[in-house]
Amino acid sequence: MTLYADIPGERLDAFLARQAQGLTRSAAQRLIEEGLVSRNGKPGKKNDKLSPGDLVEYTIPEPKEVDILPTEMALDIVYEDDDVVVINKPKGLVVHPAAGHQDDTLVNGLLHALGDQLSGINGELRPGIVHRIDKDTSGLLAVAKNDLAHTVLASQLKDHSMHRVYEAIVCGSFREDSGTVDAPIGRHPSDRKKMCVIARNSKEAVTHWEVVRRYRGYTHIRCKLETGRTHQIRVHMAHIGHPILGDTVYGHKKPELGQDSQCLHAGTLCFAHPRDGRPVMVFAPLPEYFQKVLEKLEKMS
């Protein structure tokens, strides 16, 4: 792959992370260390300072074969038919294997429970996975059993006709009873593991919210996603000054109220069935960890 530098003085690794689609800064550094990146025909160094017009060439190695092992686990299946299964994912469970985390993911559990009854559109690492929720977010996740179901559900996600509603506890109090955050989200310019509200290299992101109950210093809200960007609710709530309680990435660095994870739960999922179009509406009650925080807030108030 060939790229041309455009910003004077930019580091080679930062340039690659910005310009090469799907490449993080750490991944760019690995390519450089493996000798797969050149600058003007010579091996590049990660801290090389580029000049406009510099020719940067890089090679992405063939992906290594990954053997995803089925793992027996207790899956909370709240809806299932021949085309779709909806899982109520507990907090702490990673959805699919990735670098550094190959085992004990939801996909490992799905392979054990459903075997080859999963769509192959997303490849071997993400069989059946139509959309994702964060590791420390609990709640509903639709899984496609075949390629037809996957294609239709993915289309509903794209045209915003699949409805996803989340319950959240956020820091601070809202004056209004409801509102909308319409702010584009993109990769954080200096921390590639984080997202942020940013105008450049971003995508449209819209979150509608309404107050469920106000407590002293905290608010229970309900969020409806119009789009589905990575970390969207967490980023949007932090952006307006109301980070998710327990979110140590976008909010306070130390847990509050004794809970061990962020208070965010995907409680409602609505979609048109991929085969016949009938409406499917699935609910997942608030998990125990969420209810305990609400009880504590009730006593504090």
Task: Please tell me what each predicted stretch does.
Residues 45-49, 222, 261:
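Short, surface-exposed secondary-structure edge patches
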Residues 192-200:
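Short aromatic-glycine motifs in intrinsically disordered, low-complexity regions
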Residues 189-192, 239:
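C-terminal regulatory/effector modules of DNA-binding transcriptional regulators
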Residues 81, 135-136, 162, 203, ...:
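Short flexible coil/turn linkers enriched for glycine and charged/polar residues
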Residues 1-180, 184-189, 283-297:
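RNA pseudouridine synthases
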Residues 40-45, 217-220, 255:
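Short alpha-helix capping/helix-loop boundary micro-motifs
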Residues 85, 166, 219-221, 267:
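Short beta-strand micro-motifs in enzyme catalytic cores
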Residues 1-27, 73-75, 199-206, 213-216, ...:
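Pseudouridine synthases involved in rRNA/tRNA modification
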